[in-house]
Amino acid sequence: MRRILATVLAVMMAVSLTACGGDTPAPSAQGSSSTAEPAAPTANVPPVEDLTGEDTSAIPGVEDGVLTVGMECAYAPYNWTQMNADNGAVAISNVPGAYANGYDVMIAQRICDAYGWELEIVSSAWDSLTPAIQSGTMDANIAGQSMTADRMAEVEMAGPYYYATIVCVTTKDSAFATAKSIADLSGGKCTAQSGTIWYDSCLPQIEGAKVQPPADSAPAMLMSLETGTVDFVCTDMPTAMGAVAKNPDLVILSFSGTDGDFQFATEEERAENVNIGISVAKGNTQLKDAMDRVLSAMNEEQFNALMDQAIAVQPAI
């Protein structure tokens, strides 16, 4: 499906300028509870299986051989905007002169390469992603979306294509930089991106936290931390690693595997809230299954290796 959303051009050009950057320092992440050092970007990522012999002409959305994928293009390292085609970036169809790159783009390209489809990237606001699937504007969203029960009631989800963990990010000079559990974050001002489990489910678990209004985007969330508007933010590990790689004054707080971690009723509930999937229209199991066939060829370690590659080429934000 080929769709051009020119009506959001002005907005997304502003996003593209925010998301552009320069040289990339070596990724690193330090925290009181963990040191999250990404593996070398040359770690093993399997070649894409050649499925071009499969007849996909009857799969809803890709009858014309084009997969139209929605993402924010402002959620590094999952996706970002840059102004050139370096490192495999793909042109953003509704933002002339701008290109999308990141882990989501890499996953989307692997799926398209497998079936011989053309990849079209459309930039969209986070809150517009699911409605765009439901209206048929997008064929799929590959946008760092958690596979929550609420979301899966509205769309089909392929994957997971990444297994995330919940973390917080603060500044090295913060009084919260030595936190050993979420209880140690009591009294701090905090936020997370709107429409995410980080804001809706995680921050409310921190007793005494001064939860601020949600941020419209991941860059806005991180800006609120860097400017001192909040003491810490809640997000997932890849977003945190990407932030720390670009700003060495930030530190990751991971309580994973401890009693002081964010809690869910069951491990199954935890998984649904942190596993990342691809959304397609409800009932479009043909497209979901086609994507799952490509994703199932990779394991968690290989997904992590691909994420490391994305972080390594992420521009400064």
Question: Where do the PLM segments sit?
Answer:
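C-terminal motif of bacterial Sec signal peptides marking the signal peptidase cleavage site
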Residues: 15-19
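Bacterial signal peptide processing site
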Residues: 21-24
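Extracytoplasmic small-molecule ligand-binding "clamshell" domains
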Residues: 31, 36-144
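Ligand-binding clefts/hinges and TM-proximal coupling segments of bilobed small-molecule sensing domains
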Residues: 42-50, 56-60, 197-214, 286-317
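Bilobed "Venus flytrap"/periplasmic-binding protein-like clamshell domains
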Residues: 73-76, 97-113, 145-146, 165-222, ...
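Acidic, polar ligand-binding/catalytic clefts
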Residues: 109, 113, 118-184, 258, ...
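Alpha-to-beta junction loops
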Residues: 117-118, 134-143, 188-189, 226-239, ...
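Periplasmic-binding protein-like
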Residues: 162-170, 246-292, 315-317
